[in-house]
């Protein structure tokens, strides 16, 4: 009987995903059928985020609406800012993100609503608020005052602004935007499996993402 045990889930196929496909043998990564290389060249991160959530790239009106909703939800509550200020300065940013998303779940007015429509709205709020929380903690650990988000800036530009008080050259912003796109989705990896396991028990989206962050914490070395 012990021979049937798959250690560490090795060889276990849990499900399939249509969101992305990783093909290392040909150095290929696709999101919803679009090559990541093309998305990096022709799209911004906001468009790719919309693609992942909605299964297709947005038209002009859809993108404008999506960006407006994201920008309108960037600000954090006073309580969350207060919690960030009390966190140890040596805390790992992934741990900060995990805790911040957990608090967002406590505060979200739709926490108990797990309908597809509510989950979409909550996903956009998490997308909007998480960079604000990370940038705020970055400033706090350096002994600097928090810089609030600017609606006039896109996600990549705004993150630089909240961290450093200014937006760098376009080439640097583009490089960061490309990085956001390339790390946006990587098929049915461990963090996705973790989130799917949590949601299968009918937990809320904030709980699933909070737990999946514990896996991402272990993969920081990939960025380096």
Predicted features, each with a name:
Residues 215, 222-224:
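Single conserved hydrophobic/aromatic residue that forms the stacking wall/gate
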Residues 1-217:
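Hydrophobic alpha-helical bundle cores within soluble ligand-binding/oligomerization subdomains
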């Amino acid at each position: 009987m012990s021979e049937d045990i798959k250690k560490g889930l090795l060889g276990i196929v849990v499900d399939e995903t249509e969101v992305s496909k990783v093909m290392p043998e040909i150095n290929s990564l696709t999101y919803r059928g679009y090559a990541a290389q093309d998305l990096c060249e022709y799209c911004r991160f906001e468009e790719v985020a919309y693609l992942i959530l909605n299964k297709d790239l947005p038209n002009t009106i859809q993108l404008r609406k999506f960006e407006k909703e994201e920008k309108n939800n960037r600000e954090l509550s006073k309580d969350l800012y207060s919690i960030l200020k009390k966190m140890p300065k040596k805390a790992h940013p992934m741990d900060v993100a995990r805790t911040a998303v957990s608090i967002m779940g406590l505060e979200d007015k739709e926490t108990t609503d797990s309908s597809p429509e509510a989950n979409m709205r909550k996903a956009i709020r998490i997308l909007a608020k998480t960079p604000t929380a990370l940038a705020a903690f970055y400033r706090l650990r350096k002994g600097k005052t928090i810089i609030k988000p600017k609606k006039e800036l896109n996600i990549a530009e705004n993150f630089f602004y909240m961290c450093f008080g200014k937006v760098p050259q376009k080439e640097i912003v583009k490089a960061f935007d490309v990085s956001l796109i390339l790390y946006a989705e990587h098929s049915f990896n461990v963090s996705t499996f973790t989130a799917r396991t949590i949601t299968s028990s009918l937990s809320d989206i904030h709980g699933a993402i909070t737990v999946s962050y514990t896996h991402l914490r272990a993969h920081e070395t990939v960025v380096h």
